[in-house]
């Protein structure tokens, strides 16, 4: 039983577990006050033996969180006596993924389930966290999932918002974007999580397994595990000034090994050089965006190039033909200078 932001993720997880034979369900609370005991009891089948109530709050000094206490009260006035436990999710703005929800059901199925637990954070002080199986990922096989690593001010986030707009305006596909920033005003880490699908998207969380990963600042290869969330056989695009021979010298061995072990298709493009030569300065976004459309095949390549150039005309037409031409050249150069690297 839950309400609010986590219910779409819970529903998605319940449907996946049901496909695999698990007998689990969800009650979404849409109207909290006045709380309707009658409607709650009618919504829960008589055969239910165990219930986990998830609240997105921590009520200090209380015997439990608000929704949990209301559910307890509802059943105390009835002749039904299921085991009811409480949990918290989404605290500290932490993501709640399907793997977290599965851990709630796994805990509920135990002989002595943990009560007043927490999901989404690692609680090493009071040890209320549940064990999470990170290998549990939901993929319908039709959604293209993309992660873009960027640097604040390099245009990556703006380009990704534009990609969403291009696909939304020109196709029947559904598009979703989540953007994550660090605390710096500029030149800080940015991460863009994009999903594209022919079906409505109900994944209200960051991508845990991507089909495509792009990294704009080459320095990140030594700072982050860039392909940790890239699926087996996925595509990795690196914007770099290094030649193919120099890559082995600069990219850490663990990253190269991960690329090889997961059979990742590795591509590079010197977006910085292209942007400088066409007159765009440090703004590499158009080059990376073009490379994304070519490699991901979210759209047919010819259509993607046409839509990109149409969006350039629409966005920069008022600034003069020179600006439009620079961006169009960046698109053309990107399609010519993509390079596949064998690891």
Feature-to-residue mapping (PLM):
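Redox- and metal-dependent alpha/beta enzyme cores, enriched for Fe-S-associated oxidoreductases
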Residues: 1-22, 35-40
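Short helix-loop-beta junction
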Residues: 12-26, 77, 166-172
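Short beta->alpha junction loops
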Residues: 28-33, 86-90
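Active-site cofactor/cluster-binding pocket
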Residues: 34-39, 47-50, 54-65, 142-152, ...
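Short, surface-exposed amphipathic charged segments that create phosphate/polyanion-binding patches used
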Residues: 42-45, 96-106, 280-285
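Extended, charge-rich low-complexity interaction segments
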Residues: 53-72, 108-126, 208, 296
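Conserved thiamine diphosphate
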Residues: 73-92, 261-263
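Flexible inter-domain linker/hinge segments
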Residues: 92-145, 324-343
């Amino acid at each position: 039983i839950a309400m609010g932001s986590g219910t779409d993720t819970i529903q998605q997880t319940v449907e996946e577990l049901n496909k695999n034979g698990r007998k689990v369900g969800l009650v979404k609370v849409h109207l909290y006050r006045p709380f309707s005991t009658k409607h709650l009891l009618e919504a829960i089948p008589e055969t239910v033996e165990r219930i986990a109530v998830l609240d997105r709050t921590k009520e200090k000094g209380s015997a439990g969180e608000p929704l949990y206490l209301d559910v307890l009260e509802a059943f105390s006035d009835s002749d039904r006596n299921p085991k009811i436990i409480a949990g918290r999710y989404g605290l500290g703005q932490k993501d709640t993924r399907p793997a977290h929800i599965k851990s709630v059901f796994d805990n509920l199925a135990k002989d002595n389930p943990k009560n007043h637990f927490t999901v989404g954070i690692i609680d090493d002080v009071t040890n209320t966290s549940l064990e999470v199986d990170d290998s549990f990922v939901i993929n319908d096989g039709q959604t293209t999932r993309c992660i873009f690593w960027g640097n604040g001010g390099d245009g990556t986030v703006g380009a990704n918002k534009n990609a969403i707009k291009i696909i939304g305006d020109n196709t029947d596909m559904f598009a979703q974007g989540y953007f994550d920033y660090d605390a710096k005003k500029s030149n800080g880490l940015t991460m863009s999580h994009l999903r594209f699908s022919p079906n409505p998207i109900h994944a209200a969380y960051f991508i845990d397994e991507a089909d495509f990963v792009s990294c704009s600042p080459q320095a990140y290869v030594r700072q982050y595990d860039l392909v940790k969330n890239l699926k087996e056989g996925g595509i990795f695009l690196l914007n770099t000034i290094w030649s193919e021979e120099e890559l082995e010298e600069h990219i850490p061995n663990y990253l190269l090994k991960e690329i090889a072990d997961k059979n990742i298709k590795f591509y590079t493009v010197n977006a910085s050089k292209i942007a400088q030569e066409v007159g765009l300065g440090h703004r590499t976004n158009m080059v990376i965006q073009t490379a994304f459309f070519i490699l991901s095949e979210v759209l047919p390549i010819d259509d993607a190039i046409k839509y990109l150039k149409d969006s350039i005309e629409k966005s920069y037409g008022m600034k003069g033909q020179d600006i439009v031409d620079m961006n169009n050249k960046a698109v053309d150069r990107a399609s010519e200078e993509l390079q596949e690297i064998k690891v």
